[in-house]
């Protein structure tokens, strides 16, 4: 008896049951002819993708003569075929789009099928597939048998095409948002480096229209006030940490557990809009990180942090200034080479507040710069949120539109 099923979510005009089958009944596993190392070079005419460069940038090439010979004599993917990684991170996929390329035998394979399955449907089936004989094991290889014995439940070819088309549209939308996000993030990095003066200069390389004149040098102590209030009355029990992406964030939200001591009455109490300097250095943060609390009304931080609030400077300007690396030179001069203790820079509050920074003389320009970067952050955040929403939608639809 044929096992007939239907998914939870379905296009209205389809009503037939789905049929259970195996990939091996639909086709065979194909692969390119083996290429030996001595047949490749670091530069050449046709890219040769190994498992380590699959889906990325090639680092090996073969001659056009070899490519044309092997393409004509041995199996080669058709446009639309879904290539699969059979070793390492098994099951990664790349849709072959007709480009001139050759792929490492046995490590990169595809299902050469008879047309009873739509490639766009197959591509997204691979996103949720449980390979036969692999699940729950430590096997890091996908053998032909694993692929061919894997069960699949199929609707009609027209319904497969409709489902595949929907997910391809979602993928295109996700790719568009991710490209835009990368562009906005790159723009921010560039503008952070160019909209604040370089060391020894008093005018930035790029300046907003309508402003002129030299910027002025200030010491941090002249434009801010140190915050040393303790959490004596347990106003807050939200222990914070500094994250590159999220700034000051709840430890439990970030680490999925609380790192701080159970008794946080001796911690500093930081309020929304105030800044914290974490002297702990790490990859990408050679001199620690300075972030403003924006996410919550208050929180607590270890007394190893240095806290302050903006007084005679626009707070948004200061927040984005400390996202750049323009303050690194001053702090590095205070923290002498080798003066590091258990992952912390050995810099005193007095030295920290004596660091110099250059700011626009006019408050209006400070605000304009702060507003520029805040708007850019809003664009970045909205794209990140949209990507998360689309990824969650795709995950849900994959669960409910396949069997």
Regions found by a protein language model. Name each.
Residues 3-7, 102-108, 136-161, 298-304, ...:
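A short glycine-rich beta-alpha junction/loop motif
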Residues 7, 161-173, 180, 216-218, ...:
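Extracellular/lumenal glycan-associated surfaces
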Residues 35, 71, 136, 151, ...:
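Short, solvent-exposed loop/turn positions at domain surfaces
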Residues 11, 18-22, 156, 167-174, ...:
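Long, compositionally biased tandem-repeat segments
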Residues 24-27, 37-68, 228-260:
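DNA target-recognition patches
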Residues 50-51, 61-127, 143, 265-327, ...:
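A short beta-sheet element
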Residues 9-33, 207-231:
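Non-catalytic DNA-recognition/assembly elements of restriction-modification systems
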Residues 1-15, 176-213, 385-403:
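Short amphipathic coiled-coil heptad-repeat segments
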